[in-house]
Amino acid sequence: MSTTVIGSWADAGDEFSAPDITTNPDGTKTVITYRTNQDGKKVKITQKIKEVKVQERVHPLIAQRKNWKKYGKESKSPPGPDTSTTQLGEKVELKLGTSWKQQEKEEEEEKAENRAQKLSVQTIRCRTCGGDHYTSKCPFKDTLGATTSSPAAESGAGDNGPGKYVPRHLRADANGNLPSKEGRDDSTTLKVSQLNSFVDEDMLRNELFARFGPLQRVTLVRNRETGDSRGFAYVSFITEDMAQRALDALNGKGYHSLILHLEWSKKKKTV
C-alpha cells in the first residue's frame, strides 16, 4: 500500500466527508469524524458532546449595557470587549456594611498587639558597657568593671565568716586584688570620649579610625536602661603604632560640634 505525504492538514481534511452528528436520547450528541494520522493511516474519531446551559444572574443595568449596540469603528465587532482597543482593569469586590468601625478597631488592636510582642522580646545587654553581648564576655570588663567589682571584693573579703560562700571570681588573692582576665592585651586600645549622642560604632569605624589601620573592635559604651550613648567608646587596633598615630591625629580635633579627647585605655608605664 502506497502512502502519500500530506503537505497540509487543511488539505487532508477535504478528502473526508463532513462530520456525522447523531443526537442521542439522553440529550447528548455523538460526533464522528475521520482523519489521517502522521503515519498516513485513516483513523476514526468519536466524540460525545453534552451541551450545558449556565445561567448567570447579573444586575439588570449590567444586562442592559451588554445589549448596547457598538458604534464607530467597533460597530462590526462581536459582543464583548476587544483586547486590542479595551484594557481590562482589576476586578475589585466592594463590601458594604455598617461594621466598618469595628473592623478598624480590630485592626488597630492587632497592630498594637504586634508592637507589644516586638517590645517584649528581650535583647542581650551588657551590664558593664551596655553593648549587645553578655556581661561575662565584655571586652572592657577590666576597665569599666573595676569600680563595680570593688564593693563585691570588699564584701567578699570582709564576710568570710562561717556559712558565707564567696564565689571564685570574687575571691581576692594574698595582696587583696581580684583575679583579672588573663591573656588580655589592652596596650593597643584607645578610649575616645566627648562623643555626640548620635555617633555610633559604624561612624567611629568608617569616619575616624579606619584610615589608621585595621581595627580589632569598636565598642560604644551605652546606658544600661535606655541604650543611649554615654559619650565615650573604646577602639582597639592591631598594633600599638597604629593606635599612637590615631591618638596624635585625632586628640583635640572637632567632630560633630564636640572636641574629641583620646587617651590610652590603660595608662602606659613610664620608664
From Swiss-Prot:
It is found in: Cytoplasm. Its main location: cytoplasm. Coiled coil: none annotated. GO terms for biological process: formation of cytoplasmic translation initiation complex; translation reinitiation; translational termination. InterPro entries: eIF3_g, eIF3g_N, eIF3G_RRM, Nucleotide-bd_a/b_plait_sf, RBD_domain_sf, RRM_dom. One of its GO terms (molecular function) is RNA binding. The keyword Cytoplasm applies. Keywords: Cytoplasm, Initiation factor, Phosphoprotein, Protein biosynthesis, RNA-binding. GO terms for cellular component: eukaryotic 43S preinitiation complex; eukaryotic 48S preinitiation complex; eukaryotic translation initiation factor 3 complex, eIF3e; eukaryotic translation initiation factor 3 complex, eIF3m; multi-eIF complex. It comes from the Eukaryota. Residues 188-267 form the RRM domain. The modification Phosphoserine is found at S77. It holds the Pfam family RRM_1. Residues 1-26, 63-119, 147-187 are annotated as: Disordered. Belongs to the eIF-3 subunit G family. Component of the eukaryotic translation initiation factor 3 (eIF-3) complex. RNA-binding component of the eukaryotic translation initiation factor 3 (eIF-3) complex, which is involved in protein synthesis of a specialized repertoire of mRNAs and, together with other initiation factors, stimulates binding of mRNA and methionyl-tRNAi to the 40S ribosome. The eIF-3 complex specifically targets and initiates translation of a subset of mRNAs involved in cell proliferation. This subunit can bind 18S rRNA. This is Eukaryotic translation initiation factor 3 subunit G. It comes from Scheffersomyces stipitis (strain ATCC 58785 / CBS 6054 / NBRC 10063 / NRRL Y-11545).
